[in-house]
């Protein structure tokens, strides 16, 4: 769900974030590049990370909160991702995902 418009730091200045599979798989890990759907050659969220993953798994990009939303944009007409606060065993949705209608809401064309 995420792309460089949601987490710009890796594309902008090669910042790194921890990456993990939420299913907590540890066997048969391989090296992966975690990329987003934006049609840019710099849309990497992580490069060469060793995790086990398969289609349908959820991958966490860790410690992204401090600069996530404030550096995020609607580049490529992409709504910004939701934000989830995780502490211990609890999680809470603290900002909902934007919708395409949210993007259009700010547009005006005068006659």
Predicted feature residues:
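Charged (often Lys/Glu-rich) extended helix/loop segments that serve as interaction or gating elements
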Residues: 1-111
């Amino acid at each position: 769900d995420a792309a460089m418009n949601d987490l710009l730091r890796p594309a902008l200045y090669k910042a790194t974030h921890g990456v993990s599979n939420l299913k907590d798989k540890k066997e048969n890990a391989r090296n992966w590049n975690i990329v987003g759907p934006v049609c840019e050659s710099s849309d990497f969220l992580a490069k060469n990370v060793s995790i086990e993953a398969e289609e349908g798994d959820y991958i966490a990009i860790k410690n992204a909160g401090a600069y996530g939303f404030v550096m995020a944009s609607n580049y490529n007409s992409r709504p910004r991702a939701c934000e989830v606060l995780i502490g211990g065993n609890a999680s809470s949705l603290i900002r909902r995902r934007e919708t395409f209608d949210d993007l259009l809401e700010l547009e005006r064309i005068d006659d």
